[in-house]
Amino acid sequence: MWLAAVFTTHPFHRLARQCLQRATPAEPAVFCRSTHISFLRLASTPTLLKAYGATGLTNRDALIALGALMALPQVSESEEPPGTFALWQHIAARDSASPKVWMDAYLAAFAISGGVRLASLDHDFRNFVPHGLDLDLLLDA
């Protein structure tokens, strides 16, 4: 969602911006350390940058973009809520090797433990709704 909100040529830019505009200081869009790092990694990946017509961006540019998001009054950051680690282990446990589950399960556990709604473009987060995830699936908007 964060990357789509920043790159105007992202196919879901409009949806992501609308989601961000719905956030308020009382009910903010929340960054955690994992989403900070993921945003910075993706915002400085040459293949993605090329896809969005943003070649030549540096790590410093990605940090500036993150800073601009963090400066918005409706955006905040949060430390890991109590119980996140145990819940993450529980909902990530699979009887198969599923490397893509780790981050999704962590973000879901963070949102559940923190009592915040998770906005995403990724349908895979539906798997965590039975565990208590309050999901705003932007593609269904």
Predicted regions and their residues:
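Short, well-structured N-terminal submotif of metal-dependent ribonuclease cores
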Residues: 1-31, 43-61
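Short, hydrophobic secondary-structure boundary micro-motifs
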Residues: 32, 51-52, 77-80, 137
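Amphipathic alpha-helical repeat scaffolds of TPR domains
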Residues: 37-40
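Active-site neighborhoods of divalent-metal-dependent phosphate/nucleic-acid chemistry enzymes
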Residues: 71-119
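Histidine- and aromatic-rich ligand-binding microenvironments
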Residues: 100-101, 122, 136-141
